[in-house]
């Protein structure tokens, strides 16, 4: 059974088009907009922007 609460699981997908992704949680009350973080993509072997997608 899923937990009720403000935190939801989101998928951070690489903008490099490699298909690599991270999963993380975000507080939907505090962060209404989609997340954009610069993280390391091991497939592309460099830091790229990861954007939030639906799980």
UniProtKB/Swiss-Prot annotation:
SUPFAM superfamilies: Zn-binding ribosomal proteins. PROSITE patterns: RIBOSOMAL_L33. The gene is rpmG. Keywords: Ribonucleoprotein, Ribosomal protein, RNA-binding, rRNA-binding, tRNA-binding. GO terms for biological process: translation. It comes from Deinococcus radiodurans (strain ATCC 13939 / DSM 20539 / JCM 16871 / CCUG 27074 / LMG 4051 / NBRC 15346 / NCIMB 9279 / VKM B-1422 / R1). Gene3D superfamilies: Ribosomal protein L33. One of its GO terms (cellular component) is cytosolic large ribosomal subunit. PANTHER family: 54S RIBOSOMAL PROTEIN L39, MITOCHONDRIAL (PTHR15238), LARGE RIBOSOMAL SUBUNIT PROTEIN BL33M (PTHR15238:SF1). Part of the 50S ribosomal subunit. Contacts protein L35. Belongs to the bacterial ribosomal protein bL33 family. This is Large ribosomal subunit protein bL33. NCBIfam families: PRK00595.1, rpmG_bact. Binds the 23S rRNA and the E site tRNA. GO terms for molecular function: rRNA binding; structural constituent of ribosome; tRNA binding. The lineage of its organism: Bacteria, Thermotogati, Deinococcota, Deinococci, Deinococcales. It comes from the Bacteria. Transmembrane segments: none annotated. Pfam families: Ribosomal_L33.
């Amino acid at each position: 059974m899923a937990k009720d609460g403000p935190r939801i699981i989101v998928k951070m997908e690489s903008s490099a088009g490699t298909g690599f992704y991270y999963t993380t949680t975000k507080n939907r009350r505090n962060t209404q907009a989609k997340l954009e973080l610069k993280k390391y993509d091991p497939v592309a072997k460099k830091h790229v922007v990861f954007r939030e997608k639906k799980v």
